[in-house]
Amino acid sequence: MSGTADRLAARIERAWQDGGALQWALRPLALLMRGAVTARRALYRCGAWRTERLGVPVIVVGNRVAGGAGKTPTTLAIVAALQQAGRQPGIVSRGHGSREREARPVSADSTAQSVGDEPLLMQRRAQVPVWVGRDRVAAGRALLAAHPQVDVLVCDDGLQHLRLRRDVEVIVFDERGAGNGWLLPAGPLREPIDAPTDARQIVLYNAERPSTALPGHCARRRLAGLVELGAWWQGADARAELPPELKRQPVLASAGIGQPGRFFDSLRTLGLAIEPWPLPDHHGFDTLPWPAQTRDVIVTEKDAVKLPLQRLRAERPGLRVWVAPLLFDLPETFVSELLAALPARRPD
């Protein structure tokens, strides 16, 4: 987004929390939004608009609120749980910011500009087939045609893509819960939190305790530690033991994610003194945003996929970039409920 758009979005988000004239002025639009969303779901549920079923069970991961609630780390954790259960999952995603319209695979040679930052991160972390496309049905069919061994699809950020028939919806909330309870633009909700569906719904809280009245499970999020960018690109794991040089003085921490404050708080729990440097979600890194004198900076994995090592060496040879991978620990009760809700692979 442009600077003007960023400032407008920030002002609207403040109005969600503070109320006042702006939030009241946006309420009529929110009521129209609620009517449109409700009507759209009703048209799909009654069969007036057709849903498309794929040849394998489908798990959709999404959230009811705008902004980062933890969908991507949830998707990665679900994929890992499916693999441990003997399933062979694949991932489909829209590919935020992608320049292409057609369904296409994500590979180690893909760029964030061509497929989106989150799909590229998921491919690197999960090492399973990942396809992106605005049409999730087309992306899913293309993935299954290219990888017939896949027996379950996980759709990242597809909760509102209703044409894709799903067996399970995993709805992710963070500490914000439903916010002020209003739909966009008067509040953060994309749709009512109790929107009806024919799929099995499982609520997962990316928080220490439930943040809505909906029953669900609480995941534990934690940082794995730190790893230098060059080693991260080569597949090295993060080390929990912090580099001594980062403990001596405050270090710059940067995050282009939906809720950067959450990342900064997690770094502090590791014992680091940080100087927060928040960036807009999906920041493109057309230029390096940090002060010229910066020697060390800690970033998220979502940002790291947009920082080729060769570029950093050419533009800022004295800068060391550290990556802090985020891990999600899913409760056993959630995994058991998810696996029990999945049917076996359907015949083609």
Curated annotation (Swiss-Prot):
Region (Disordered): 89-117
UniProt keyword annotation of Nucleotide-binding present: yes
Residues that coordinate or bind ATP: V65, A66, G67, G68, A69, G70, K71, T72
EC identifiers of the protein: 2.7.1.130
Class in the EC hierarchy, top level: transferase
GO biological process: lipid A biosynthetic process; lipopolysaccharide core region biosynthetic process
SUPFAM superfamilies reported for this sequence: P-loop containing nucleoside triphosphate hydrolases
Pathway: Glycolipid biosynthesis; lipid IV(A) biosynthesis; lipid IV(A) from (3R)-3-hydroxytetradecanoyl-[acyl-carrier-protein] and UDP-N-acetyl-alpha-D-glucosamine: step 6/6
Reported function: Transfers the gamma-phosphate of ATP to the 4'-position of a tetraacyldisaccharide 1-phosphate intermediate (termed DS-1-P) to form tetraacyldisaccharide 1,4'-bis-phosphate (lipid IVA).
PANTHER family according to UniProt: TETRAACYLDISACCHARIDE 4'-KINASE, TETRAACYLDISACCHARIDE 4'-KINASE, MITOCHONDRIAL-RELATED
Family per similarity comment: Belongs to the LpxK family.
Record-given protein name: Tetraacyldisaccharide 4'-kinase
Species assigned in the record: Leptothrix cholodnii (strain ATCC 51168 / LMG 8142 / SP-6)
Lineage: Bacteria, Pseudomonadati, Pseudomonadota, Betaproteobacteria, Burkholderiales
Gene: lpxK
